[in-house]
């Protein structure tokens, strides 16, 4: 990888109460790189993401973001550095219109890896353009998730983290979201993706990391891993 790491995790451990979930995880993402995070349910993927974002308080190890040590940072401090998070849930304001949701997310004056002004978000999501005056509560689940991704892009991030962003959505919406993920990748924004469709993740990623019981057990070039028997064994496919 020629570009320096914008996110690096070294020896990361995490606990929920007395439950030790992450066991010395090492992970790195370079500028403009897309990393796929794979593993069966309950293997620590979402916990790792929540730990990187500062949501898990019981943690050890070093996490560096854009050269800064954020090992003890709070979620809002991580976000201010240029990280946008799109979870499975629909992160929109139900009582605000589509336009108001997007405008609220905009961080004027911040220079990210790529510029996603309001007009570009509208071009990216034609469905949202058609519903620009609708309240968030009036949108379908898929449209709300599109709006959540649009809000993330309006913050002009250098890193977008998508955690099961297509979960439970209709196939047409899923295809639309993957199309947008491809555009995000092409724009030079670094991306960390978790999704059940591991083949799609590998197609859209530069590299992939596999978690098993809170540990990294496999890592490498995404396309090279697609037909790996070792990967199939870890994922149970």
What are these regions (language model features)?
Residues 152-153:
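ABC ATPase C-loop
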Residues 38-40:
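The feature captures the beta-strand-to-loop junction immediately N-terminal to the Walker
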Residues 17, 57, 73, 96-116, ...:
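ABC-type ATPase nucleotide-binding domains, specifically the catalytic core motifs of the NBD
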Residues 135-139, 143:
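Conserved ABC ATPase signature
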């Amino acid at each position: 990888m020629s570009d320096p790491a914008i996110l690096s995790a070294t020896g990361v451990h995490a606990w929920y109460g007395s439950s030790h979930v992450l066991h010395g995880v090492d992970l790195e993402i370079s500028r403009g790189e897309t990393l796929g995070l794979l593993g069966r349910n309950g293997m620590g993927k979402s916990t790792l993401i929540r730990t990187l974002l500062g949501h898990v308080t019981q943690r050890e190890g070093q996490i560096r973001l854009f050269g800064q040590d954020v090992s003890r940072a709070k979620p809002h401090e991580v976000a201010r550095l240029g990280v946008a998070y799109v979870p499975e849930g629909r992160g929109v304001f139900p009582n605000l219109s589509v336009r108001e949701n997007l405008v609220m997310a905009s961080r004027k004056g911040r220079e990210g890896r790529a510029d996603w002004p309001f007009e570009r978000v509208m071009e990216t999501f034609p469905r949202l353009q058609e519903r620009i005056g609708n309240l968030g509560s009036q949108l379908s689940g898929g449209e709300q998730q599109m709006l959540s991704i649009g809000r993330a892009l309006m913050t002009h991030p250098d890193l977008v983290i998508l955690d099961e962003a297509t979960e439970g959505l209709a196939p047409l919406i899923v295809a639309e979201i993957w199309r947008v993920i491809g555009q995000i990748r092409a724009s030079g924004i670094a991306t960390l993706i978790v999704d059940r469709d591991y083949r799609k993740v590998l197609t859209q990623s530069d590299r992939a990391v596999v978690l098993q019981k809170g540990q990294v057990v496999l890592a490498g070039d995404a396309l090279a891993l697609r037909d790996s028997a070792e990967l199939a064994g870890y994922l149970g496919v």
